[in-house]
């Protein structure tokens, strides 16, 4: 159910060939379990597909009975993570990119082993750059170290968590604001999808802008922002849109969001 032009889709095929699994082809869509009669042993999905499947009882039943479910291609917000905590089988969030041939680390989302920290594979080494971005050494897939744009934290056990992306930092009046941290905070209190982006401003240099689907109540969103966010994180503008911009793999399309905020 992943597009084959992306590494995530290609690696599903590779895994099935290496493990001798029966590959069940499903056209990439928002409801990959819709036509299935029984749960697969293994599945790889993006958060949007998992979220959609949870809204349909028949699909949710199948989702719960996938023995090994990996979720990648985007952040898993608090509400989605909470819905997966009680799943009976193995549910994982993955971390990786095209350059690493899919994921190089996993974190468990359910059961006693659930964690906020990613565990790198045995042959993968990680460290932080001077800018606190994650550096990956995965010699089996890449001869040289790979410096990412992901701002990370590494604990004493060698596990890591992602705080945001270097290129997703808003500099507003000299205060650096990480887009993902604002979104994560709001998702704990809002059940509706939103996106945070930036727009140029003569006074502050950049301002925080919140995009939301136009059918939602702006007053409710604004009230949550004013109550739950620090003053310098609070959006200066709220923009209703027909649809929040997403990439082909279901990630927030940050470039398009910025263009919308700039009125382009």
Regions found by a protein language model. Give the residues of each.
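Active-site glycine-centered loops adjacent to acidic/histidine catalytic or metal-binding residues
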Residues: 46, 73, 96, 150, ...
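AMP-binding/adenylate-forming core of the ANL superfamily
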Residues: 125-147, 151-153, 159, 213
């Amino acid at each position: 159910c992943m597009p084959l032009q992306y590494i995530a889709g290609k690696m599903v095929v590779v895994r099935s060939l290496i493990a001798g699994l029966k590959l069940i082809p499903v056209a990439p869509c928002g409801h990959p379990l819709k036509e299935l009669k029984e749960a697969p042993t293994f599945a790889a999905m993006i958060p949007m597909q998992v979220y959609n499947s949870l809204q349909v009882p028949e699909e949710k039943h199948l989702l719960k009975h996938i023995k090994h479910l990996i979720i990648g291609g985007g952040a898993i917000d608090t509400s989605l993570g909470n819905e997966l905590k009680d799943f009976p089988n193995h549910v994982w969030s993955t971390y990786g990119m095209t350059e690493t041939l899919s994921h190089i680390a996993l974190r468990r989302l359910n059961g006693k082993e659930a964690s906020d920290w990613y565990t790198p594979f045995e042959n993968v080494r990680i460290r932080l750059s001077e800018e606190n971005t994650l550096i990956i050494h995965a010699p089996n897939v890449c001869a040289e170290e790979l410096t990412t744009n992901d701002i990370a934290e590494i604990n004493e056990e060698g596990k890591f968590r992602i705080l945001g992306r270097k290129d997703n930092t808003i500099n507003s009046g000299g205060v650096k604001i990480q887009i993902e941290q604002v979104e994560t905070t709001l998702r704990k209190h809002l059940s509706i999808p939103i996106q945070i982006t930036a727009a140029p401003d003569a006074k502050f240099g950049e301002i925080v802008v919140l995009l939301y689907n136009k059918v939602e109540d702006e007053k409710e969103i604004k009230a949550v922002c004013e109550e739950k966010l620090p003053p310098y994180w609070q959006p200066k503008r709220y923009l209703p849109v027909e649809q929040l911009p997403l990439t082909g793999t279901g990630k927030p399309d940050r470039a398009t969001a910025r263009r919308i905020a700039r009125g382009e």
